[in-house]
Amino acid sequence: MSANTRAAVTRTLSKGKRGLRRSLHFVPGGNDRMFEKALALSADSLILDLEDSVTPGNKIAAREHVCQWIKETDFGDQECLVRINPQDTTWGSDDLRAIMEVLPDGFVLPKVASQQDVDYIDGVITELEQQQGVEVGAVSLILIGTEVPAAIFNLHQMAHSERVEGITWGAEDLSGAIGAKAKRDENGNYLEVFNFVRSTCLLAAVACNAQPIDAVYVDIKNPEGLARECKTGADMGFTGKITIHPSQIEIVNSAFTPTQAEIDEANELIAAFEEYEKAGKMAFTFRGQMAVSYTHLTLPTICSV
């Protein structure tokens, strides 16, 4: 396979700091029982949460708990991420600086609205990395880039920071911000405005070589609905999804992991590209369909590269 072909496929199955990043599982900050349980789950990434799952009166204690968790825990293959509070809150700045003392793999940033928001946090992290003698860029960022309306029109600029490894989206906060009465129709499908935001997140992430991460599915008692949404997301081009309940993790991992049949087909397609490339041809028929460029090498291909 040529170098160009390899470059074309490396985005399609995304990796975090420690391995694959298919499932990103929220763990409420300060809840020792849930944290201990999460370490035994098959989630690729754990998001230790200091924002929505923590009441205002418990914010400082939860921050101290999370710092202690990171300091004392061997996460193994699980990526350790922390969702801090927004920087315009009472807790945001202290969250960032305190968590940086124990060096997580990355931060999940809620309610960012502009490139200036991301640049500011990037600058603070860079300063703290230098103070601690670690490589600049070691700590990554994942943006929740659609929680305020203004952010949707700034996603491309926000994602341009080299520190940004992924972009996800969310309908919950956005629905309140725009005054939406519902997020889904009677069939469980997103209303048009949320479909637009979902697609915009995907396109902005891919355009900036960041991972597109699909939003949480809040109906934890509807595994069939989750599976359908995972399939739609994977078909669109998302390579991971956020989870909020342990029962969701295996469904998400399965949806964003290629089957053996897909891997076999990808291997055949790679071989066909190489054969026709040697013959000076870049358009040919593969399994009854026209293959005309390296973009046909999608998610399963990376498993054989």
List the predicted regions and their residue ranges.
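Expand to "…catalyze enediolate/carbanion chemistry for C-C bond making/breaking, isomerization
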Residues: S2-L299
